[in-house]
């Protein structure tokens, strides 16, 4: 699942990047032999999938009693193009000296907002509700505030994926111009659905993926009952850095 999500976002570019998979065990009294076993088990399935896709992934395993500080330090040291955090099925509101890495972590949901406050790179929170590779992919676009998502959307369409676009009904002509351009370039791959509220995002297929900005998620998540009915989510907080050279990955 982890690699398939990144493959959707970055396509062929994925193989050109340095990927780091990080797993943290909270505590300080773990037996070294047990730690080695946990490390091996944590990355087994991911490494199998990476080998199948011919993608190099470095494994980073640490035992710590300062989880948030450890992650923030690691991100600031590695300067990843994206930090991906796992949040289980619900979400409320990578080797040293190697820049340009993609990094993902499994994390307790109550720590995510704290980390978002402290790191500048794009942060993607994956809420897994039985996502199945190859299932329907949808983007939620709330207007020009979500313009940074178009870089991921465009790359996905370039790679031949079909995408459903949930568009907030707005009179913003600039935003509608971007949508019209997508429809002209990818008429057979885009399906438009205008929406007014979060209840319009509930679909019959439950194994798909719904991608939205963190800002849109914050605005839509007030109705927790409806949010629980949505398919798997990928919530992306935009890059806080400015003037970075790697616009394709970091917007």
Predicted ranges, named:
Residues 1-14, 81-251:
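Intrinsically disordered or low-complexity boundary/linker segments at protein termini
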Residues 1-44, 50-58, 143-149, 159-162:
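Non-transmembrane accessory domains of multi-pass membrane transporters/channels
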Residues 68, 72, 199-202:
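Short hydrophobic/charged patches on amphipathic alpha-helices used for structural packing
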Residues 32, 39, 64-65, 105, ...:
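A conditional alpha-helix N-cap/helix-loop micro-motif detector
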